[in-house]
Amino acid sequence: MGQKVNPKGLRVGIIRDWEGRWFADKNYLELLHEDLKVRKFVKTKLQQAGVPKVEIERAANRVKVSIYAAKPGIVIGRGGTEVENLRKQLEAMTGKQVAVNIVEVKKPELDAQLVAESVAQQLEKRVSFRRAMKQTVQRTMRQGGQGIKISCSGRLGGAEIARTEWYSEGKVPLHTLRADIDYGFAEANTTYGKIGVKVWIYKGEVLPAKKVAQVEGGK
């Protein structure tokens, strides 16, 4: 089962938290569509900043949007002008009071979504898919990843018949629920058609905090 399902969704509520944190009774559908619109808008507008994920929190008529970015300087802009413009656009889109929070991604090489997008960009620039995969795997392992697997599917190298090729290093235990595995997907639009890129990165195990037994007598 771990081989088939999205590793992020499988671990939500176990070692991962939700990316949308709010509760809705009757207007769930509208808020869900609003979330999708906000995420799509932010990803498109801040393409150069490297945005792997957008977290959304809601309370009454307020929305808090946390944008994770590899290049936070591009998001903030000179003197915070860009982030203020973004906030106003999001307020106009949602009709609610919006607070924007920027979080820096310290190691982009260990973020599966950014890695997948990087490989897709290289494929669009006609870099050999084997070379792109191999170099990316080496970079991730150098940055402290414990395992990585990259899969490319489509008309690789302009071949007549589409196929899937993958490259991996280290270990990626997809069945282990306490394993911190990040997953990312991106598409490369080449002259021969789309090439799908999937990336799994294993960062180590997340062990539950041990409960310290309280000693009687205040010791």
From Swiss-Prot:
What are the protein's UniProt keywords? Ribonucleoprotein, Ribosomal protein, RNA-binding, rRNA-binding
**Which branch of life, at top level?**
Bacteria
PROSITE patterns assigned = KH_TYPE_2 (PS50823), RIBOSOMAL_S3 (PS00548)
Q: What range(s) does the KH type-2 domain occupy?
A: 38-106
Q: Which residues form the signal peptide?
A: none
Single GO biological process annotation from the record? translation
SUPFAM superfamilies attached to this UniProt entry: Prokaryotic type KH domain (KH-domain type II), Ribosomal protein S3 C-terminal domain
List, alphabetically, the GO terms of the cellular component aspect: cytosolic small ribosomal subunit
Q: What Gene Ontology terms describe what this protein does at the molecular function level? A: mRNA binding; rRNA binding; structural constituent of ribosome
Q: Name one Pfam family in it.
A: KH_2
Extract the NCBIfam families matched here: rpsC_bact
Q: Which family does the UniProt entry place this protein in?
A: Belongs to the universal ribosomal protein uS3 family.
Its biological purpose:
Binds the lower part of the 30S subunit head. Binds mRNA in the 70S ribosome, positioning it for translation.
Q: How does it assemble?
A: Part of the 30S ribosomal subunit. Forms a tight complex with proteins S10 and S14.
Name under which the protein is recorded: Small ribosomal subunit protein uS3
Q: To which species is this protein native?
A: Desulfitobacterium hafniense (strain DSM 10664 / DCB-2)
**Gene assigned in the entry:** rpsC
